Amino acid sequence: QPTKVVLNDTVWNIHPSHIAIDSGRVFIDNFLFEHEDQYLRIDGKLTKKESDSCRVDLRNIKLDYVLDIVQFDDVEFGGLVTGKVHLKSVMKNPVMRTRLNVHKFCLNRSLLGEADIAGVWDKELGGVRLDAQIAEKGISSTHVTGYVSPKLKGLDLSIRADSTNLGFLQPFIEGIFSEINGRVNGNVRLYGDFKHLDLEGEVRAKMDAKIDVLNTYFQIRDDSIHISSGSLDFRNVKVYDREGHDGLVNGYLHHTKLKNLMYHFNIRGNNLLMYNTYEAGNMPFYGKVYGTGNVVLDGGNNAMTVDASLTTGNNTSFTYIT
């Protein structure tokens, strides 16, 4: 009989179908789960025989529905999945091949583009080996290879980025940087269990971001960032403020599996806009400070120290409220 199911405040229809279970075999005749232009259709046989197969058709299924099943929630994926999954010999030696398209594929709410994903089941891993091409037409391309394993509760992905949107980093560095905008080129490995992910690689970035405690925006026009397990290292990275004044940044951002951030940055500026705040109730001072010299930021565990040795430049204003 037709059945209605509510999933995330959306009413889905389960159409009449026939499912039979007999001696460890499952026979599915046209199971259809749909809502408007979204559907999941399953048809075929789940048995030990290599000659028996099952096909799963998807159209506009939200990617986060799928990943909720494996409790992969430290990284947020988005997009609409359309494609086919072919299964054989599921009850003995599973064989799976899939070809999926993800429309408006997002990572941490940052658009990466249209994703074309090919996958095969790996029995040893208990997961899927995948090869994905992700592209924003005329803007960027990202190539991802590796595996995702529910059995191991982890993943290991090699990512080759060509002008890839790096806004996906924002959740990992909340409270230090905000309003991240830019593109990245290079190679990165994302690996670890779903709850304890890590990164390594080397990239060149073109980006701008705000350092929250200083309320200043800095731009990297094209420079390298070194990524190793637990650390992002900045070595003589040239930065610019929004008025074109320049400086150099040295330092690091340390993390424990993308959590518990600790950082140390030395910003050496040449008439660089180092501080730009307005009168507010939580601080006894405010102002706009152009400086030549050094500002050192140290922080972590919800604490921060700022140490400055500067010669102030023209157009500097600073007010201490008594």
Where are these regions (language model features)?
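Interface amphipathic segments
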Residues: 1-187, 194-322
